[in-house]
């Protein structure tokens, strides 16, 4: 995960001080790209331990089209609690846009199903895209999408995915996002008969919050370790049939967890 540590170093070396909506303050750079080849291992950060359970359940929650935190809470995942209303609702965020994007005719488009169809029928298409940035519904979202646009690409039997992320909390959020979209890539490759290729992560405003600077320095002092391997249940053939028990992580030997307060 040298690419990730290089991002942190670049922000510290080149970043500018900026104010933000949370009032915390950041050091920020604009425009950065990382690339992870899944043949080299599953890109789960090793310079601090990550809570894989939260990553998996959040992704399954998105794929369900769910926008209420009750499903997450039932499984001990609390990462969205701060933005939910008293009923647990978050508005038309990721899951809704992925599975139920409103169309011009009064219906809805299941973007994930369309991706699966295109990969099977039109793998060379340049339109295999999922977008979460629905301008007409941003005001109803409790948190507008940070990771908002993905495109799939097939070459030589390998599936790659590029993600554009407009806002990148580089200490807390980015490690989760890397693992989540790498896992989504692996899952979609699995059910479409392709091999997982590269996850390309393109960042807009990549920042470190000022209250995370000590944690970042600690992380940069640690030597990265070998990447683990993610094994999927070979019996699962439908993307929406995956359950938590269908994922097995092998060889994960990270440094200890580093705590940080999320900026809300």
UniProtKB/Swiss-Prot annotation:
DUMP binds at residues 21, 126-127, 166-169, 177, 207-209. The keyword Cytoplasm applies. Transmembrane segments: none annotated. Pathway: Pyrimidine metabolism; dTTP biosynthesis. Keywords: Cytoplasm, Methyltransferase, Nucleotide biosynthesis, Transferase. The keyword Transferase applies. One of its GO terms (biological process) is methylation. Its EC number is 2.1.1.45. Belongs to the thymidylate synthase family. Bacterial-type ThyA subfamily. Homodimer. It holds the Pfam family Thymidylat_synt. This is Thymidylate synthase. It is found in: Cytoplasm. GO terms for cellular component: cytosol. Its main location: cytoplasm. The lineage of its organism: Bacteria, Pseudomonadati, Bacteroidota, Bacteroidia, Bacteroidales. One of its GO terms (molecular function) is thymidylate synthase activity. HAMAP family: Thymidy_synth_bact. (6R)-5,10-methylene-5,6,7,8-tetrahydrofolate binds at residues 51, 169, 263. InterPro entries: Thymidate_synth/dCMP_Mease, Thymidate_synth/dCMP_Mease_dom, Thymidate_synth/dCMP_Mease_sf, Thymidylate_synthase, Thymidylate_synthase_AS. The active site is at residue 146.
């Amino acid at each position: 995960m040298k690419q990730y540590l290089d991002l942190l170093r670049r922000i510290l070396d080149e970043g500018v001080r900026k104010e933000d909506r949370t009032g915390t303050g950041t050091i920020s750079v604009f425009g950065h790209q990382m690339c992870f080849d899944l043949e080299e291992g599953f890109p789960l950060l090793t310079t601090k331990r990550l809570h894989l359970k939260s990553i998996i359940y959040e992704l399954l929650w998105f794929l369900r089209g769910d926008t209420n935190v009750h499903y997450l809470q039932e499984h001990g995942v609390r990462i969205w609690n701060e933005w939910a209303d008293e009923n647990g609702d978050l508005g038309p965020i990721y899951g809704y846009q992925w599975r139920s994007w409103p169309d011009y005719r009064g219906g809805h488009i299941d973007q994930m199903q369309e991706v699966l169809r295109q990969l099977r029928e039109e793998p060379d298409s340049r339109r295999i895209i999922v977008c979460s940035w629905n301008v007409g519904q941003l005001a109803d979202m409790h948190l507008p999408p940070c990771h908002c646009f993905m495109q799939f690409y097939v070459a030589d039997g390998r599936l790659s995915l590029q993600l554009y992320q407009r806002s990148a909390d580089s200490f807390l959020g980015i490690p989760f996002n890397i693992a989540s979209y790498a896992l989504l890539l692996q899952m979609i490759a699995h059910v479409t008969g392709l091999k997982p290729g590269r996850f390309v992560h393109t960042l807009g405003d990549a920042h470190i919050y000022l209250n995370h600077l000590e944690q970042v320095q600690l992380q940069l002092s640690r030597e990265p370790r070998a990447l683990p391997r993610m094994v999927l249940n070979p019996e699962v053939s439908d993307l929406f049939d995956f359950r938590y028990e269908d994922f097995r992580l092998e060889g994960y030997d990270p440094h200890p967890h580093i705590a940080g307060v999320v900026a809300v």
